């Protein structure tokens, strides 16, 4: 089976890219070959061409975001017309795919959420920005493609797709993210103490962990303000962002250098998960962050907003707390999680077992086979007329 997987910029640290890499690795045993179509990709062990994957470059031109967005879509259309694939799976908003995985959620919803927390001039720009208009226009066109199957990675995104674009539920398949549950393990208290000392942290203080790229969207600044009101907590911020310098400056301005560690991007987050006592991601919008799954597998209670796709499961299984995207609410949630850490830690580990990668891989393989069989049946039907 030959499939095309489309992701414009392939950053191995990104959640969507890690999902793609894991999916390809797990499906290679089923004789699935993937061609990844991308504008650019960072080189590492997982981005080299192998027997189960290769890379096709999409040429992008243009001087602004809107032009580049449209240019990428046109380049992909050309590539698809000159190559034969059994299935086309897109992680970008474009026309002509068989499957669109909503890993980035609904752009119209993101813009609406952003507008709510923005000053008036930003609200105005969000309405007229050519890039946002182009993306939302494409989303609307995709909703009218009868042969496009949507894959939502959370019930949050599934419902938003219905609410925003009236896509019938029959065209939406819910496949939540999967994770290798054996790759992340809980740490003993003794190990946590040892590792905290190695990082220069106080071994006696509870440690909150944040992992994510996109500090403003994922609530890193609000979390920092919450920690400022909790002198008995400490924080580790892991991830790359254009505002990395700004958040370091804010840590210094608040005089929190002794209890806040900003690491920048890390290819291996396991050492930080081993140190942490809980995980916090107070995002403005996050369809289904893989970092939360890694935290659950590490038996870390999680604190998230209701705009994070896994929030409903966290609440249902008492594996953490749902907070508002405000410092006071985050601080209160962290205190409650710490107070109930033993129970919530056990619940977090149990919840993680629902997201075993083998389960989601099988769901994807079933979907691929179903769609390919449907294509064959349609071709036979067309050939008889």
Indicate residue ranges for each PLM-predicted region.
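Aromatic "clamp/platform" in nucleotide-sugar-dependent glycosyltransferases that forms part
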Residues: 265, 284
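Short acidic/histidine- and often glycine-rich active-site loop of Leloir-type glycosyltransferases
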Residues: 174, 294, 307-317, 321-322
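Donor nucleotide-sugar binding/catalytic pocket of nucleotide-sugar-dependent glycosyltransferases
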Residues: 129-190, 207
């Amino acid at each position: 089976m030959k499939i095309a997987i489309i992701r414009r910029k392939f950053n191995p640290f990104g959640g969507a890219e890690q999902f793609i890499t894991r999916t390809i690795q797990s499906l290679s045993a089923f004789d699935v070959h993937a061609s990844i179509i991308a504008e650019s990709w960072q080189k590492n062990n997982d981005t080299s061409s192998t027997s189960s994957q290769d890379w096709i470059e999409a040429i992008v031109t243009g001087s602004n975001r809107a032009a580049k967005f449209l240019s990428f879509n046109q380049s992909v259309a050309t590539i698809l017309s000159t190559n034969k694939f059994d299935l086309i799976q897109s992680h970008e908003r474009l026309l002509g795919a068989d499957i669109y995985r909503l890993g980035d959620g609904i752009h119209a919803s993101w813009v609406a959420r952003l507008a709510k927390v923005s000053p008036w001039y930003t609200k105005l720009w969000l309405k007229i920005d050519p890039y946002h208009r182009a993306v939302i226009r494409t989303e609307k066109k995709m909703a009218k493609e009868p042969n496009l199957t949507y894959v939502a990675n959370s019930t949050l995104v599934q419902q938003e797709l219905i609410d925003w674009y009236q896509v019938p539920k029959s065209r939406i398949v819910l496949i939540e993210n999967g994770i290798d549950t054996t790759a992340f393990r809980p740490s003993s208290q003794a190990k946590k103490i040892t590792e905290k000392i190695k990082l220069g942290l106080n071994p006696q203080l509870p440690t909150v962990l944040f992992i994510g790229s996109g500090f403003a969207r994922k609530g890193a600044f609000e979390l920092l303000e919450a920690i400022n009101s909790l002198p008995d907590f400490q924080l580790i911020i892991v991830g790359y962002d254009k505002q990395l310098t700004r958040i370091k400056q804010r840590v210094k301005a608040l005089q929190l250098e002794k209890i806040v560690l900003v690491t920048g991007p890390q290819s291996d987050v396991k050492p930080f998960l081993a140190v942490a006592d809980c995980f916090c991601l107070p995002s403005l919008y996050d369809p289904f962050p893989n970092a939360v799954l890694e935290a659950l597998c590490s038996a870390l209670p999680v604190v998230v907003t209701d705009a994070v796709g896994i929030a409903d499961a966290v609440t249902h299984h008492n594996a953490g707390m749902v907070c508002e995207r405000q410092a006071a609410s985050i601080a209160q949630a962290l205190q409650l999680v710490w107070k109930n850490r033993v129970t919530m830690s056990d619940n977090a580990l149990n919840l993680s077992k629902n997201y075993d990668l083998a389960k989601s891989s099988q769901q994807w393989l079933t979907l691929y086979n179903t769609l390919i069989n449907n294509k064959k049946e349609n071709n036979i039907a067309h050939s008889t007329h």
